[in-house]
Amino acid sequence: MGAKRVVPARELSLEEIQEIKDDTGLDMECFVHGALCYCYSGQCFMSSMLGGRSGNRGRCAGTCRLPFYLDGTKNTKNAYPLSLKDLCTIEHLPEILDHGVDSLKIEGRMKGSRYVGEVTRIYRKYVDLYLSEKPYKVESEDLKILMEVFNRGGFTGGYYKEYHGKDMMSMKRP
């Protein structure tokens, strides 16, 4: 087919991504920052059924970000049981790059220019530090900026290193 680069599903571990790269020789472009879907990548039908737009075709209606009341009341405590925290891998960049990831993908669709600019600037800074082969620690000010431009009750490292279960869920924020 002539493919040179693939974007693997966000649910894969770093070991699985490395295995695909080793087996195929293809470049890997991986999501490192942005929204995570409650469903497996490409398998969300909730957006189509409840929102009338296909999340599998880049038109997610964000139905997993709506409040759902599991106890039959409109109790707002934990009203967002399907809302995952956003992915933030800034502290795991060396491991991600060491596992053969060639290109980093930052969510920008339907985001403002401040979000895209700040997130890109911060990731660029730490990619450059990694490439300079100097050890570094992510500065608290940079983490604060990432939290301020957008988050859903904190961040998660996603599936790259381990499955985090309920720690990946926001519950209180859409």
Question: What is the meaning of each model-derived region?
Answer:
Residues 3-174:
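Surface-exposed amphipathic alpha-helical tracts and adjacent flexible/coil segments at the periphery
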